[in-house]
């Protein structure tokens, strides 16, 4: 438990920061789900457009420290591979 004023302030800031980070993480997951939904429907154009929208947002979350660089790259790579497989079929 926070005892001195500076640690109490840090605890308050952590609560705010955690809530903000959770909302950003949720937003990114929603964009990823939109891409996955387009892939499930078999819409190549819709999936590529959704990925084009989602990729810069995923990258910006890396800069903010919400996701690691490797997780973002892995996610984008897997989505792109699914889209390429969709086009091939």
From Swiss-Prot:
This is Small ribosomal subunit protein bS20. GO terms for cellular component: cytosol; small ribosomal subunit. The gene is rpsT. The lineage of its organism: Bacteria, Pseudomonadati, Pseudomonadota, Gammaproteobacteria, Oceanospirillales. SUPFAM superfamilies: Ribosomal protein S20. NCBIfam families: S20. Belongs to the bacterial ribosomal protein bS20 family. Binds directly to 16S ribosomal RNA. Transmembrane segments: none annotated. It holds the Pfam family Ribosomal_S20p. HAMAP family: Ribosomal_bS20 (MF_00500). Keywords: Ribonucleoprotein, Ribosomal protein, RNA-binding, rRNA-binding. InterPro entries: Ribosomal_bS20, Ribosomal_bS20_sf. Coiled coil: none annotated. GO terms for molecular function: small ribosomal subunit rRNA binding; structural constituent of ribosome. One of its GO terms (biological process) is translation. PANTHER family: 30S RIBOSOMAL PROTEIN S20, SMALL RIBOSOMAL SUBUNIT PROTEIN BS20C.
């Amino acid at each position: 438990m926070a005892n001195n004023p500076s640690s109490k302030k840090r605890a308050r800031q952590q609560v705010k920061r955690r809530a903000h980070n959770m909302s950003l993480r949720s937003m990114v997951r929603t964009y990823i789900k939109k891409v996955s939904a387009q892939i499930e429907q078999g819409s190549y154009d819709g999936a590529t457009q959704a990925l084009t929208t989602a990729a810069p947002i995923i990258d910006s979350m890396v800069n903010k420290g919400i996701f690691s660089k490797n997780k973002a790259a892995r996610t984008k790579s897997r989505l792109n591979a699914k889209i390429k497989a969709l086009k091939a079929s």
